[in-house]
């Protein structure tokens, strides 16, 4: 059935529930788990005078790293096969790209994500994935 599961994390309580569900399914089915965290690159002004340009910083930062480390630790304690990915860009795109790369059978996400202006500009991660994923999708419902 499901042998390769992709799950997204950003360190939020909603993402933690998604990781827990991925662990539960992976344990039951003997599946490998691919943990993905996405980050937006920081834009920094470089230069001066007439020609200012933006330069992208490649480092994902400690927030993404710690989110991934916590999720990986949670799964490895259970003896699960885990691989992690920190990807630059939109969270939904990052999850779907990893799912394609590893031929995933399932993507798991929480039902809540970005809020406010960021959600308005980029859209809901669960919504985008549910409409465009290359595989089955499980949206974990959280309280609230």
Predicted regions and their residues:
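Short, hinge-like loop/turn segments at secondary-structure boundaries
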Residues: 50-54, 101-103, 125-126
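Short secondary-structure boundary segments
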Residues: 37-38, 110-112, 141-142
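Conserved beta-strand positions in the Rossmann-like core of class I SAM-dependent methyltransferases
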Residues: 34, 83, 138
């Amino acid at each position: 059935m499901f042998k390769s599961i992709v799950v997204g994390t950003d360190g939020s309580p909603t993402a933690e529930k998604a990781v827990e569900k991925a662990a539960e399914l992976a344990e039951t089915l003997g599946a490998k788990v691919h943990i993905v965290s996405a980050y937006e690159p920081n834009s920094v002004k470089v230069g001066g005078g007439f020609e200012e340009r933006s330069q992208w910083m490649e480092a994902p930062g400690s927030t993404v790293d710690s989110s991934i480390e916590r999720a990986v630790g949670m799964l490895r304690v259970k003896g699960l096969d885990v691989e992690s990915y920190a990807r630059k860009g939109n969270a939904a795109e990052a999850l779907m790209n990893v799912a394609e790369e590893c031929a995933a059978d399932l993507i798991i996400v929480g039902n809540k994500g970005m809020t406010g202006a960021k959600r308005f500009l980029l859209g809901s991660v669960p919504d985008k994935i549910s409409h465009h994923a290359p595989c089955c999708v499980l949206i974990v419902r959280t309280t609230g």
